[in-house]
Amino acid sequence: MSAVGPDGKKDNLAGITHVIWPEAAMPFLPLEHPDALAAIGAMLPDGSVLVTGALRREKTAGGERRGFNSLMAFGGKGQLIATYDKAHLVPFGEYLPFNTVLGAIGLEKLTKGLGSFATGPMSRPLLTIPGLPPVAGLICYEVLFPGSVIDRKLKPGAIINVTNDGWFGDTTGPRQHFHQTRVRAVEEGLPIIRAANNGISAVI
């Protein structure tokens, strides 16, 4: 992240309230590196919030570590404000289908080696981020599924979608993914703020 505007002037960052980074923007576990978060927070414009895709992990009661693909919001001092854990994981990319069955028949090493992310709550809780209406978070291809991207009973005011489209390569994939996002915005009647890594970023 640059501490100056595109024309090289630092004061051009004045008035920026939210900085949004895509999925896979941080190559480390931010909650385990408070010094890095503090340094990033110091670069943010005063009073602004960083919203970013990031990974986190936690220990279960049994001592097992579980990893999550998450959307996080951080304040100006690097403090965590809000977290959403991806609920709709990518088969074989983020989890191994039937992993409990494979584990039960003695293939634990296979199940642990492929797709290590845990599933976030399907209730899709809203994020409370200063300066924004209640936000529904969507990570990557979660935005593709009509009728299931938000809980309408919770009445979000906007959707933030972070994605890493780098694995599509030089194909039509990033454009198709973006057009599907536009359709979701129309279906839900909500603005979508989209930050993409090697894809199309936009406010829809």
Where are these regions (language model features)?
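Enzyme catalytic cores with a strong preference for nitrogen-chemistry domains
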Residues: 1-204
